[in-house]
Amino acid sequence: RLNIPDVRVENGRVLFSGDENALARANMNLRTGERVLLVLADFKATTFEELFQGVYRTNLEDFIPKDGNFPVKGHCLNSQLMSVPDCQAIVKKAASKRLGEKYGVSWLPETGAKYQLQFSIMNDRVQLYLDTSGPGLHKRGYRAVGNDAPLRETLAAAMVQLTRYRGRDFVWDPFCGSGTIPIEAALIARNKAPGMYRRFAGEAFAWIDPSVWGDVRAEAKDKEFNGKYRILGSDNDPKCISLSIANARKAGVADCISFRDGDATKMDLPAQEGVIICNPPYGQRMMEQKDAQRLYAAFGKHVR
């Protein structure tokens, strides 16, 4: 729990209000969110001039310093303005004019920290954001290399959360690949912040005191649990098992997970009850469809 008030759910996103501490806690602790974006402006625009003026009116100087590097990216949907490259150019031009006038310069060097601007134009409504995360939050920092069909860490965490797992049950991923599902289960069991081993774009922002991030990391560390957990990851590829063990070590949860090389349709399990969470081969990248169908049938008989 992040103890953040005023939370509102919309299609594909969650909105909340808060200060710099809330922003840092969200980046550090969100398991299934992909980015934490700060809303800078919200306005209607059906023409390039309206888009320009909306961005130009935004107090960008409160967030982007004189030497800030502010690239622009975004997307458009069901709107009069549908050309993303043109909208990018307009947003960049308006932001440059605003910042240049506020700082009294005709040219902005953009040699400092990165302040990624994003825009969303949907149904003629423009929202301008500042990306505080940097690389997507699925990049926890523990998986340097994945297998041939890696599962995003955020999706793996969501799968574990859907089972309401809290560390008490036996958990088995019979097709663990690079170990993402068992590792995310262990992070949840330990109450370990998923962002503990990575950095965020917001750590370089001039308007956020560095102590905020240090305090948030210390707070997250204090909330970790220590215990014995029954989490098993298995795969019939020894290379995947070696990779899983290495990733679990980097995530700081190697002591919480057992990894085993073996056939999921024949493996003896250490528990009669528990939860199976997996991303099985489905006949696209890892094997043929007929082979996947035979695997499902054999696996179903084995665990019945």
Language model segments and positions:
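Conserved S-adenosyl-L-methionine
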Residues: 151-268, 285, 291
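Glycine-rich S-adenosyl-L-methionine
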Residues: 287-303
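Non-catalytic nucleic-acid substrate-recognition regions in nucleic-acid-modifying enzymes
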Residues: 2-115
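Low-complexity, glycine/alanine/valine/leucine- and proline-rich hydrophobic stretches
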Residues: 259-260, 276-278
